[in-house]
Amino acid sequence: MSRRVLVDSIAYLTKEYKVDGFHFDMMGDHDAESIEKAYLAASALNPNLIMLGEGWVTYAGDENSPVQPADQSWMKNTDTVAVFSDDIRNILKSGYPNEGTPAFITGGKRDINKVFDNIKAQPTNFEADSPGDVIQYIAAHDNLTLFDIIAQSIKKDPIKSENNAVIHRRLRLENLMVLTAQGTSFIHSGQEYARTKQIRDPAYRYPVSEDKVPNKAHLLVDEKGNPFDYPYFIHDSYDFSDAINHFDCTKATDTKSFPENTKTRAFAKGLIALRKTTDAFNFKSKADVDARVTLLTVPGTNNVTQEDLVLRY
């Protein structure tokens, strides 16, 4: 019955409301056959439809009736639905539960070959038989925004212009790596201009007593351990007001007041345009990727070590 509800609902939304994409939160809780049937029903109505989900290994069905879950392990057997790659997320900027730990973009040396494998849509923690199986992302609706996690990781208060510039340069590099990676690139809404979920209410400009700490907030500190000016940043904002969840269009468009934000947005826009003009970042098969995407900074040559902070491909 649950499969019938799932398939019929997806087909109805596709037919009646012309929905052309579906993102399953916790898709690994479902069985693969149900998700596949939902995709086939919807794609019969719209062949250009996209379906993706969180393929974390979370299935908890009847152990006496084993099935293939709709998780990352399914990707070697399907080319219809894609999953998010936590591997590229963790290796480039760190992720739950280790947010704030320095990663490749924030000063933490990483295995160059593993970084490159992820750029090729060949994650090291699950097998994908084609690039289209892999959603290449750094940030999404969960956890801190990319801007905020960079600030946390490098311990630089963005209220200082020189720190803000450093954070933006690292964010632009993250966007560059995601938007030139094989597979399907995904950016969090607002990531293109460096969206933040910092609380800028005067009541929270300085640390408050424990009983007044905002729900689902991280207190960020600089390299000396001093709290940021307005130190609270929300990491789970689905039930917060527009004060946290709004899109600050002024930051995205006002070049005079927000030169770094508008520069970051223009950079992302250019990368998206570049990606659309060529198939060089969107090869269809693993064989094509292996034949045509080459690592130039090979560990052991030109002073590049196995774990390093340099990558050229």
Segments from the language model and where they lie:
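Aromatic- and acidic-residue-enriched carbohydrate-binding clefts of CAZyme catalytic domains
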Residues: M1-R4, D8-E16, F240, I244-H246
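Aromatic/hydrophobic pocket-lining residues that form the small-molecule binding cavity
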Residues: S2-L6, I35, L171, T264
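Conserved phosphate-coordination/catalytic loops
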Residues: R4, D29, A165-R169
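Short acidic catalytic loops
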Residues: I10-D29
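Generic structural signal for well-ordered alpha-helices
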Residues: I10-T14, I35-Y39, N175, A268
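Loop/turn elements at helix/coil->beta-strand transitions in domains of secreted/extracellular proteins
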Residues: Y17-G21, N46-I50, Q182-F186
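Active-site-proximal helices and loops of the catalytic beta/alpha 8
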Residues: M26-A128, Q191-R265
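Loop/helix patches that line or flank the sugar-binding groove of alpha-linked glycan CAZymes
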Residues: P131-Y313
